């Protein structure tokens, strides 16, 4: 999972849409068509997606699903510890599976974002914990600079 998350949401070992739907049921939630389609979109392309992008993917299969429904479902999935959001620059928050916790390098010039290897931050996380009692939330940890192409 990488360096410590420092978030209160539980982390669940979910590897499929059906695993998440079982978790939703266990938590007393409803399994709706829009929730299933959203999960399929996330699992089909487990990268970073804005809520708007996910809405487009879901609406391609169910045009009546509104953006507000996507946001409500993402909020519930985040509460369950299935997805997390990250802020990669000045754009909207992006969502990805919680099991893929990682830090980001974000280019301030072109806006590109790449996954940063957790190993780069282990000593920082250890030191922050040891010296300050602070646990780094890797889902929200981005380092801004200039990418190779923009230098």
Describe the predicted segments one by one.
Residues 1-13:
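Short, intrinsically disordered or compositionally biased N-terminal tails of bacterial proteins
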Residues 14-28:
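Short, Lys/Arg-enriched N-terminal segment that forms or immediately precedes the first helix
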Residues 31-33, 44-50:
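Short capping segments at the starts of secondary-structure elements
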Residues 36-41:
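Pre-recognition alpha-helix immediately N-terminal to the DNA-recognition helix
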Residues 53-59, 70:
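A short acidic, leucine-rich amphipathic alpha-helix
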Residues 70-80:
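Basic amphipathic alpha-helical segments that dock to polyanions
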Residues 79-151:
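Non-DNA-binding regulatory cores of transcription-related proteins
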């Amino acid at each position: 999972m990488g360096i410590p998350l420092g978030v209160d949401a539980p982390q669940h070992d979910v590897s499929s849409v059906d695993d998440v739907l079982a978790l939703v049921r266990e938590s007393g939630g409803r399994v709706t068509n829009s929730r299933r389609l959203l999960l399929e979109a996330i699992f089909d392309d487990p990268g970073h997606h804005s809520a708007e992008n996910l809405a487009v993917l879901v609406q391609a299969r169910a045009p009546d699903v509104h953006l507000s429904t996507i946001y409500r479902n993402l909020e519930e999935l985040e509460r369950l510890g299935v997805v997390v959001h990250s802020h990669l620059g000045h754009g909207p928050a992006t969502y990805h599976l919680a099991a893929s916790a990682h830090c980001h390098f974000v280019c301030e010039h072109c806006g590109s974002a790449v996954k940063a290897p957790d190993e780069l931050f282990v000593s920082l996380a250890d030191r922050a914990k040891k010296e300050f009692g602070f646990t780094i939330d890797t889902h929200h940890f981005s380092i801004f600079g200039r990418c190779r192409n923009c230098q």
